[in-house]
Amino acid sequence: MKTTLRAAAAALCLAASAGAAASAATATWPTKPITLVVGYTAGGSVDLVARTIAPELGKRLGQSVVIENLGGAGGTIGAAKVVKAEADGYTLLMGSGSEVSIARLTNPAVRYDGEKDLAPVTFVGTQPMVLVGKPGLPAKNAAELITLARAQPGKLSYASSGVGTPLNLAGELIKQQGKVEITHVPYKGASAMATDLLGGQIDLAVMVLSSALPHIQANRVQAYGVTGAKRSPVAPNVPALAETPALKGVDMGVWFGLMGPASLPRPVVERLNTEMQAVLAMPEVKKKLAEAGVEVTPANPAQFGGFIRRETGRYRTIVQTAGIQQ
């Protein structure tokens, strides 16, 4: 009996020591560089957001924040690395809706659950998408486009950057809201998609607004509307699709946020969020993100978590209705 009690006491002491060590590590965090994983190659929207924020975040934390690009599989390789990483605050993710919420709804091979396996830290903001049409398409605005599409079901085509991407889901949401049948043509990149749109090989495309804007401003394409609930400050002359009665339920953007492994210690989450809020309030950071079409709307961990749950629910409805599967 005494031996059992001694063993139990030793176990309790060991647990207490481990807990104290963990608390001490959290209190002094960070003591070394932090890796910020981006699940895409350099040069894309998520990478741009990460590289805009990382230097300033590093200054405030007193440690370097190093970008690690792990491109491939729609961002899921990078997200999976963070899911499996030690929850010590030294491996973080600049996440987006694609790998955090959409991937597991469209791809059975994705084993993690972004809602449960990643800890929301700070919501950064959204980047609007826009529906554009090829030169000469006989529809001057979104209302006329819906009329045209209804008159010839399945004849019009729209392009996106791939099956299961936010651009694809936005296109399907437009179809569902407008009660039209438009054929989806997936592309592997925005460049090829824009080339074929300008050449008239496809009728419509859902693009990130910042990518489409030069073509819109040069009158090379017709802009039918942004996919957000209201007009974008980047292109105030482009209407929101939701301004058209048949499309009033269209409200979607490409979103970005800082995340970590699910069991990231609360003090680390709070410190990161505090410093992120300060970084996102910096005029130079806001200016650079705005130039890329990112509308900064920072939110705390609880708000960000609620946003992810709501968006995942919306994505699920779109995916199931459209039958999207990779």
Where are the regions a protein language model picked out?
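N-terminal (or domain-start) structured segment
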Residues: A24-K116, K155, K179-V206, H215, ...
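Hinge/capping helix and adjacent helix->loop/strand transition within the periplasmic-binding protein
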Residues: K84-Y90, L105-A192, L241-A246, W255-K288
